[in-house]
Amino acid sequence: MTTRREFLRTLSGAGTMGVVWLRPETATAEPAPEVTALRLTQVRGACIAPQYVAEELLRAEGFTDVRYVQKAGRVESLKAVASGEVPITVGSLGPILIQIDEGDPLVLLAGVHVGCFVLFATESVRTIRDLKGKTVGVTELGSGRHVFLASAMAWVGLDPRKDVTFAVHSPAESMRLLAEGKIDAYQAFAEEAQELRARRIGRVVLDSTTDRPWSQYSCCFMAVNRDFARKNPVATKRALRAVLKAANVCAVEPDRAARIMVERGYAKDYEYVVQTLRALPYTRWREDDPADTIRFYAVRLHEVGMIRSSPQKLIAQSTDWRFLNELKRELKG
């Protein structure tokens, strides 16, 4: 088991970039966080490893009580953030935009990484357009994978409301059905893609880590409850700093990050997790403009009737890039 002391000591010795990312001077010069107890969502997916790898970094930021709260699904997890029960999360952008459009008080702070989603299909599906009239497995309607695929379909002129049938199953069941040809495609997420490749189930139709335009936009964002951010700006910035440092850790030390995920029960298969972390560009938050990602996805979701708000309204009312811009200057390396 990797202890807190071992984790921080090893990262501090991870080379020049590691030292820069983890140096405490800036954090200690700031006021203490307004709250010392912090709750974050606990959901499946190796790609959001920064949220879990950040645990010890959050403690170093002054949060003495850090806990991860598990809900029934991703939609319920976002509802918990909106209610303030769990004030902070890292999650897929699409569902967050839908919740904001419905009036939930969520604020986007930063894009965390690109990638995550890989669409696997039978030989009858060679492109996204071939999904018309087909059945696709997803784990939950309104989840990140469902909303991402809806966006991808909108990009090629399909209407996910009528051109495809979504079949809701667990990941294991969807993989089985795809292998047996009982569904035509499965929208895989994070380490599931590594398992499907290893088991030689289906073929890749779309990989959001490498295929344009998806590879140009962040998949997962850090979001916060609006009231929490207003009342606790220091805590909000410190939490964001810990997660972005953890994203850098995932880029530089994917093996160690994967080990933390498995040891602490956030993932099961070390090899699948480490393969996922090695493939994802976790340092893109430094250079990408998160507003560009919001514009891109908001247009797609508006086209298929999933949101009513314009990209301009979403950006103006539900984003706050101040902390991100400050951290881009602070965490140079």
Give residue spans per PLM region:
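Short, solvent-exposed loop/beta-turn-alpha elements that line the ligand-binding surface or hinge
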Residues: 58-63, 210-215, 282-290
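N-terminal secretory signal peptides and thylakoid transit peptides that target proteins
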Residues: 1-15
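Pocket-lining segment of extracytoplasmic ligand-binding domains
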Residues: 94, 173-263
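Conserved C-terminal helix/tail region of periplasmic/extracytoplasmic solute-binding proteins
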Residues: 302-333
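Short, glycine-/small- and polar/acidic-enriched structural segments
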Residues: 30-168, 177-180, 184-190, 201, ...
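Secondary-structure end/capping motifs
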Residues: 231-309
